[in-house]
Amino acid sequence: LEGTRNIFDLEGQTLEEITDHLTKTFPDAIIRVIGDPELQVQKAAFSAGAPGSQAHIRQLRRKDINLVVIGEAPEWESLSYVRDASQAGFPKAMIILGHTVSEEAGMEYCAQWMDAFIDEIPVRFIASGDPFHQ
């Protein structure tokens, strides 16, 4: 897996393969997917939490990015943009992990980082997990 802080080169993998990997990585998460399962992903952008639809759309407008993996987004904006693009034949897709799921690894890292210099009180990571169930 190569890339920058939030752009990853996933060339050679399909949307379905990436979704399967994320489902195994986050077995308790309710992962939602928009796009053709057979889409050959080139590059993916990752946006934890909820940075807003304009951030997602800005990533999707790039020709080199054809998948965004996000925490959450307004369904009437980002999700509709991807669905419309996919249905119109553009190679675009979105995987929605859920807000909490997308941020939890970063919060665990943050707790470890803070624990290294905060001595006055204990610092611990408490996993919250996905609040939704099927």
Feature map (PLM): residue ranges:
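Active-site catalytic microenvironments in core metabolic enzymes, especially phosphate/sugar-handling
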Residues: 1-134
